[in-house]
Amino acid sequence: FNVTATSEIYTLSLHDALPISTTIPVLAVVVGIILSYWLASGFDFANISMGLYGIGIAAVGMLSTLGITLATDAYGPIADNAGGNAEMSGLGKEVRRRTDALDSLGNTTAATGKGFAIGSAALTGLALLASYVEEIRIGLTRLGQTILELPNGITVNVHNASFTDYMLYYDVTLMNPKVLSGMFLGSMMAFLFCGLTMNAVGRAAAHMVEEVRRQFREIKGILTGEAEPDYARCVQISTKGAQREMVFPSLLAIIAPVATGLVFGVPGVIGLLIGGLSSGFVLAIFMANAGGAWDNAKKNVDRKSTRLNSSHPSISYAVFCLKKK
């Protein structure tokens, strides 16, 4: 019987439970945020401005390795293209075996590059909130408002107000339903964006399959090597599909904060940023690790010359081979 769906569920739960999948990266970022904030603030957590500055400097330090990160991330596609060229050129099995080994290494380097990108983005999460508060200060100044009336009866000048003053002024607390609603919406946005992009890949792949079938039907001699396929048409479908299908997800990332701000105000937008950052960070690590593991498992199965069909527990066997490796 077909156990592919069950195997996929098992694999998702497996990689979600592995400590090295999400726990260690999240703990590393948490420790980095706390240490950078603590050291830059002079061991005083009340010094928010200097603590945020320390987090920003820590993110810049992490991004200083961008050159090496980009080089390692670009290694994977190069090795993959080399393997494709070797296969289409009809080279020997030894060449293909070596390119497959390089491609597997490329998956590891790509995962490393993704980890740096995800970690640096999460590290600047608190600085992102601070920059939004600074934009609020600029907006209030443009509107002509010069005084903030805090709930405790104290009035503070807009230019001299601290981060905490703005939180008190807009009642940014977990007991505020606007903040909580924004956090739920932000958490939803991460999963919605991933779902839209994955569906886009499926639709583009379906169009590509239809084009390949059309060429098989209409262009005689492709299967026998007597005629050349229309490669340009396939490239055109993938390029147009990639651009067209990303329009709505991109607009969603722009419209969601604006719509949330119009409905829930500043507390809702801050909650949206917090929810999107926290859920998106963990989701990004999980999907990157699970995808890389599946890819390497598939290569391990192919290397053992295992035929995947509807009656074969493909994914569970692939993960088993990966664990044995």
Q: Where do the model's predicted regions map?
A:
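Short "domain-exit" segments at the C-terminal end of structured domains
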Residues: 308-325
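Intrinsically disordered, low-complexity polyampholyte segments enriched for Lys and acidic residues
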Residues: 2, 304, 323-325
